[in-house]
Amino acid sequence: MFTVTPAKIYLNQEKTPVSEQFNDVYFSNQDGLAESEYVFQQGNHLWERWIVYQEKHFVIAETGFGTGLNFLAVTSLFRQFRQQYPDFPLKRLFFISFEKYPLPKDQLQQIHRLYPQFSALSQQLCDYCLDAIQGCQRFHFAETTLDLWFGDIADNLPQLGDYMQNRIDAWFLDGFSPSKNPQMWNDKLYQQIFYYSKPQGTFATFTAASAVRKGLISAGFEVQKRKGYGKKRECLCGIKNSTQQQNAKFPWYLNQPASLLSEDIAIIGGGIASLFTALSLLKRGAKVTLYCEDEQLALNASGNKQGAFYPQLSDDDDRNIRFYVHAFFYALQQLQWAIKQGIEFEHEFCGVALCAYDHKSAVKLAKISSYQWSKSLYQNLNKEQLSEKIGLPLDCAGGFIPQGAWLAPRQFVQNAFSYLQQLGLEIKTSQKITALDYRNLQWVLTNEQNETFNHQVVVLANGYQITDFVQTAKLPLYPVRGQVSQIPTSANLLKLKSVLCYDGYLTPADKMKQSHCLGASHIRNNKDRHFSHQEQRENQQKIQQNLASTDTDKNMDWLQDIDISANIARIGVRCSVRDRVPIMGNVPHFEQQCLDYRNIFNLRRRKQPIPDAAQWKNLYLIGALGSRGLTSAALLGETLASLIYAEPLPLSEDILHNLSPNRSWIRKLLKGTEIK
């Protein structure tokens, strides 16, 4: 359901990889690299176009990633371009590729050894290789961003969605010959390629098959034959000479990029959502100013001493599972990046244990196991195996996430913000912004002292206080109080090797081997931040009751070491929404949308035109991360930055719809329910 089938290959006499699934070579027996350069780079006139290109990023899409040779070759070419023309407008290459049967890491490495000139790029690509999960995974290289979509292109290409209409500059139509892979080469594919191509966008392909040529012409391309590579007589290339703009299929969820004139962006917040949004914006060259109402950063929901880091693998909506797995993998990338930059924070990639402590949790974990995740992501363990993983006896089975971890959120956020200041981030603390007003093509921010600050774009990332503004007051967000207990360690508790999750969580000892974090309460619509003796007791009772053993021979004495008597705890107020899914994107104009869509149920039924969603211009938000901010913030921040800059988005359209800030009232309106 979520995982994809790996490729099966062998090397022929010419040492060329051959697919067992398609009984076809991945590239020419003569010279795969020369073929790639001739067919795809020259066929799309890349170098000549880059020299005169006036935008900041160029987008290439490819229909079959295969060995990654096309990616390595064009990334190397773009690096040469940037080195030769560092002051030209074009700064970044986006490479979108689709792959139904991904090659395992060891086979990629074996094939790439044929091309030692790409050894550094190949190593970075192979280091990124994690589990191939249905959907998009984003990987960053020096000058290139790779969006690798795993799964059938017939399922994934439509998931680029309304947003990507007219945004792709060039296509590499690859993916085995049409006679060997007829399921891919079809009229629907050609129509979608045309839909996503920019006016004057191009394609190139190794084939000259009549059905392919006619299909591309029928879709709207002007198609030319050119000399084929090597022994092939001909191949095809073409251009989209059209400025046609089709109506969006889902206009009520259509995201809108910013109108960027000066790239002057303000972020209101001070936690992990603000951090990763600022990081992604700074990497794009933005001038970013952060406004935080507290004297220090990370004093609210991002301020715990230790936090658990792992994906949510069970949900009634598979979109949420896919989102959290992709977010987890992306966050792993970013954490490794932070470590390489020398950003100091306590952490331990010790794995996370999920306990089947009652019938409901056992059913939930059984459902997770049924998805057949790879063992590197999730392992189903009996109670003896789970006990061994955590280092303490348990009387229940469960699951284990080997790549899970604990880290120190406050330390990470504060030190990472200090690093971002070196990249140009301006931080203004003790600045509570009380009002937003859009005038003269910019946002005017007003603080409690009635001082004003002007910025072109604003991102709201201030947790449950997102709704403090007139523009956001109708968003159905609410505060959730959470108290995390800090308990002393003991000889028994020092044996805990992994994060332990039940109807709460217990972390291993901190780096000083002095204390553990025990969490956490969950009180809706409560933003009080005073210590609660009752919640402290409940944190203790949850672990002792959930994990208590009925086996008198089982030594569970370690549970009695959970000592809350010092009454040390930290209280934070998280931001949540009823469906417990984050929100990210444009700030919707509630009143205008209710007016435009008051009759949307009948408009859809009659197939009448529906306007695009009304949004507040250049105003964005990221929020409702709940207790999953460590996992979700990095990918959400990257997606939001990509949206602001009109770049490809690293999430499928169905997931983006599920993250849309207006989803609560749009779902009602689509059913014909009146919104007041």
Curated annotation (Swiss-Prot):
Q: Where in the cell is it found?
A: Cytoplasm
Give the EC number(s) under which this enzyme is classified: 2.1.1.61, 1.5.-.-
Cofactor annotation: FAD
In residue numbers, the region (FAD-dependent cmnm(5)s(2)U34 oxidoreductase) covers 268-676
Q: Give the span(s) annotated as tRNA (mnm(5)s(2)U34)-methyltransferase.
A: 1-241
Q: Which GO terms describe its biological process?
A: methylation; tRNA wobble uridine modification
* Keywords attached to this entry: Cytoplasm, FAD, Flavoprotein, Methyltransferase, Multifunctional enzyme, Oxidoreductase, S-adenosyl-L-methionine, Transferase, tRNA processing
Q: Which GO terms describe its molecular function?
A: flavin adenine dinucleotide binding; oxidoreductase activity, acting on the CH-NH group of donors; tRNA (5-methylaminomethyl-2-thiouridylate)(34)-methyltransferase activity
Provide one Gene Ontology cellular component.
cytoplasm
InterPro entries registered for this protein in UniProt: FAD-dep_OxRdtase, FAD/NAD-bd_sf, MnmC-like_methylTransf, SAM-dependent_MTases_sf, tRNA_MAMT_biosynth_bifunc_MnmC, tRNA_MNMC2, tRNA_S-uridine_synth_MnmC_C
Entry-linked Pfam families? DAO, Methyltransf_30
Task: Give the main location.
Answer: cytoplasm
The record lists the catalysed reaction(s) as: 5-aminomethyl-2-thiouridine(34) in tRNA + S-adenosyl-L-methionine = 5-methylaminomethyl-2-thiouridine(34) in tRNA + S-adenosyl-L-homocysteine + H(+)
Which family, according to UniProt? In the N-terminal section; belongs to the methyltransferase superfamily. tRNA (mnm(5)s(2)U34)-methyltransferase family.
Its biological purpose: Catalyzes the last two steps in the biosynthesis of 5-methylaminomethyl-2-thiouridine (mnm(5)s(2)U) at the wobble position (U34) in tRNA. Catalyzes the FAD-dependent demodification of cmnm(5)s(2)U34 to nm(5)s(2)U34, followed by the transfer of a methyl group from S-adenosyl-L-methionine to nm(5)s(2)U34, to form mnm(5)s(2)U34.
Protein's name according to its UniProt entry = tRNA 5-methylaminomethyl-2-thiouridine biosynthesis bifunctional protein MnmC
